[in-house]
Curated annotation (Swiss-Prot):
This is Uroporphyrinogen decarboxylase. Homodimer. The record marks 72 as: Transition state stabilizer. It comes from Geobacter sp. (strain M21). Substrate binds at residues 23-27, 72, 147, 202, 315. Pfam families: URO-D. One of its GO terms (molecular function) is uroporphyrinogen decarboxylase activity. InterPro entries: UROD/MetE-like_sf, Uroporphyrinogen_deCO2ase_HemE, Uroporphyrinogen_deCOase. It catalyses: uroporphyrinogen III + 4 H(+) = coproporphyrinogen III + 4 CO2. Its EC number is 4.1.1.37. Pathway: Porphyrin-containing compound metabolism; protoporphyrin-IX biosynthesis; coproporphyrinogen-III from 5-aminolevulinate: step 4/4. Keywords: Cytoplasm, Decarboxylase, Lyase, Porphyrin biosynthesis.
Length: 339
């Protein structure tokens, strides 16, 4: 098996910088669209054989150094008692607004409530055995709360922030419950065979550093501390957190995910020996090849040869990116960083 990704997570020497892409199994790939055309998004998430097929596609097509389970961060929320639909974005029919709503949420039994996720992990370990490691993942408690309280995507998640400030007891009770669920969900993925875990906090960066420290950090800290992490690296990605890396680092984990709004070299100076993942602007993949190569080289140069770099985009790959651009980017990373 290609162990570059896991080695880099632990800061070990590698022959070339490993690379994978957030949302690498997705709409930009014709092979993915062929599978997706036969089912709904939720059916794809809930059918282990199909989830396995689309998870493996980018490994074979792009030549990336890790696979990430095909699923959605909101998958474990539905069995907590919230009706979820994708039309096309995520929508909860009845958002959480009161203490009674929080108390009505249950902690799912992962083996019986989301067996399709765990079955996909087991299938993937067999499928990928001679290829690359498998990353399991979940949403951070704060980002999950954003969707559960708002009921759908939002630019400012005002309903969640209103709860945070005006109903702190309800907010705390909700966050505690989500954190407990999240811990059990990610530990179930680890038990099923996930070789690394990524925690996505897509909306954590919309808070001030002080609010992040008060309202988010304790829960992410508790989540990471509660994972069965023996030989399982944890990647913590908070989009938009470039101004508060010192605080985010306190959450724990082994690898800090970085978006493209931060200079990777300066981030490494702040983070010390902690491994990092990132951080190319996803829209660079629309550029001519010479610009893609220039930007890949810039990120590698900012790293200055330090161990513990996993190359990635600063957020998910966009659906309209030509696949050949992603293939070229992966090749650039390997070629330019080869020892």
């Amino acid at each position: 098996m290609n162990t570059r990704f896991l080695d880099a997570c632990w800061g070990k020497p590698v022959d070339t910088v490993p690379v994978w892409l957030m949302r690498q199994a997705g709409r930009y790939l014709p092979d993915y669209m062929r599978v997706r055309s036969k089912c709904t998004f939720l059916e794809l998430c809930k059918t282990p054989e199909l989830a396995t097929e689309v998870t493996v596609q980018p490994v074979d097509i792009l030549g990336v150094d890790a696979a990430i389970l095909f699923s959605d961060i909101l998958t474990p929320i539905e069995p907590m008692g919230m009706e979820l639909d994708f039309t096309p974005g995520p929508v909860f029919a009845k958002p959480i607004r009161t203490m009674a709503d929080v108390e009505a949420l249950k902690i799912p039994k992962m083996e019986t409530d989301v067996p399709y996720v765990l079955d996909a992990v087991k299938l993937l370990r067999k499928e990928l055995a001679a290829k690359v490691p498998l990353i399991g993942f979940g949403g951070a408690p704060f980002t999950l709360a954003c969707y559960m309280v708002e009921g759908k995507g939002s630019k400012d998640f005002a309903a969640l922030k209103k709860m945070m400030y005006a109903d702190p007891e309800v907010y705390a009770a909700l966050m505690e419950k989500i954190t407990t669920m999240d811990m059990e969900y990610l530990n179930a993925q680890i038990k099923a065979g996930a070789q690394a875990i990524q925690i996505f906090d897509t909306w954590g960066g919309m808070l001030s550093p002080a609010d992040y420290e008060r309202y988010v950090l304790p829960y992410t800290q508790r989540l990471i501390n509660g994972l069965d992490r023996t030989n399982i690296p944890v990647i913590h990605f908070v989009k938009g957190a470039g101004t508060m890396l010192e605080i985010v680092k306190q959450a724990g984990g082994d690898v800090m995910g970085l978006d493209w709004h931060v200079n990777l070299g300066k981030a490494r100076d702040i983070l010390g020996d902690m491994a990092v993942q990132g951080n190319l602007d996803p829209t660079v993949l629309f550029a001519p090849n010479e610009i893609i190569e220039r930007e890949v080289k810039r990120v590698l140069d900012e790293n200055a040869g330090r161990p513990g770099l996993i190359f990635n985009l600063g957020h998910g790959i966009l659906p309209t990116v030509p696949p050949e651009k992603a293939i070229f980017m992966v090749d650039c990373v390997h070629r330019l960083s080869r020892k």
